[in-house]
Structure formats: C-alpha cells, structure tokens
C-alpha cells in the first residue's frame, strides 16, 4: 500500500517539476502572444531623438548668432518635446506597447508647432540657409521614423501571408 502511495507522490512531483515536458508535442503547447522586442531600431530611435533632433535645434539657435528670447523659448520647447518623447517611449517600452499612442503623438505635435512658428519668423527673407537645412534634416528624420515603424511590420506581414 505504501509503495502505491509513493508512486502517486512521485508522479505528482514529476508533473510539478516539468520532467514530463519532453514528451509533450508542440501541438499541445499554447501559442505565445507576439511581443515587441528590443532591437537595433530602438537604439537608433533613441539616438535620433537625443542627437539629431537637438542638433537641428542647435543649428537654429546658432542662426545669425542671435540669442533672442523667442529663439531661447523655442529651443527650450524643442528640448522639452524631446524629453517628453524620451519619457513616453521609455514608459511604453516598459509597459510593452508601441512607442507612442495617437493622443501622445498629437500632444508632441502641438509642442513641435512652436518650432515651426519660429522657422517662419526667423527666415530673414531667405538670406540664410541654416533654417532650411534644419527643416530638411527634421523632415528626413520624420520620414526615417515613419519608415522604421512601417517597414518591419510590412515585412513581417508579407512573411506571415
């Protein structure tokens, strides 16, 4: 009688420790939900957010070597936007979500409107090329962000179908 009870206890212990998992087929194992992964795209996104975008603002700040109140406020608004973007990306990556929700993108777009308004004021009738260069770099950066978001998903979708 005691041997039968010991065999039952040993079988229960084997189930709890996972010793019988080698006999399971993958057909009986539940599929894991797809999750975003930390990759080189995340590192490049952070590098762009923390290096290229502030560099564009620096070009505007050095434009004509004038430190006006409007230029300083615009630079501060731009750096605040970059800081908010970094915080939101870090929070959403920690929660395992996509980098920015539509509401967060709209809020960051409103912060970026101050920079666009400064571009219209500081062009000096087209005599300086620095604001145009900064605008081109910012536009290229936005296109790269969009492509870095869309292309991996399009590639994964084409493989899945």
UniProtKB/Swiss-Prot annotation:
Give a yes or no for keyword Transmembrane in this entry: yes
Q: Where located?
A: Virion; Host cell membrane; Host endosome membrane; Host Golgi apparatus membrane
Q: What is its main location?
A: virion
Question: What is the superkingdom listed in this entry's lineage?
Answer: Viruses
- Alphabetical GO biological process terms: viral life cycle
Q: Which UniProt keywords apply?
A: Host cell membrane, Host endosome, Host Golgi apparatus, Host membrane, Host nucleus, Membrane, Transmembrane, Transmembrane helix, Virion
Q: What is the recorded function of this protein according to its Swiss-Prot or TrEMBL entry?
A: Plays an essential role in egress of virus particles from the nucleus, cytoplasmic envelopment and virus-induced cell fusion. Forms a functional protein complex with gK and this interaction is absolutely essential for their coordinate intracellular transport, gK glycosylation, expression on host cell surface, and function. Together, they modulate gB-mediated virus-induced cell fusion and virion egress and therefore actively participate in these processes.
- Source species, please? Suid herpesvirus 1 (strain NIA-3)
Q: Which GO terms describe its cellular component?
A: host cell endosome membrane; host cell Golgi membrane; host cell nuclear membrane; host cell plasma membrane; membrane; virion component
**Any Pfam family hit:** Herpes_UL20
- The protein's assembly and partners: Interacts with gK (via N-terminus); this interaction plays a role in the coordinate transport of UL20 and gK to the trans-Golgi network (TGN), and is required for their cell surface expression. Interacts with gB.
Query: What family is this protein classified in?
Result: Belongs to the alphaherpesvirinae UL20 family.
- Work out whether the entry's keyword set contains Transmembrane helix: yes
Quote the InterPro entries the UniProt record gives: Herpes_UL20
**Transmembrane stretches, by residue range?**
42-62, 69-89, 106-126, 131-151
Q: How does it sit in the membrane?
A: Multi-pass membrane protein
Protein's name in the database: Protein UL20
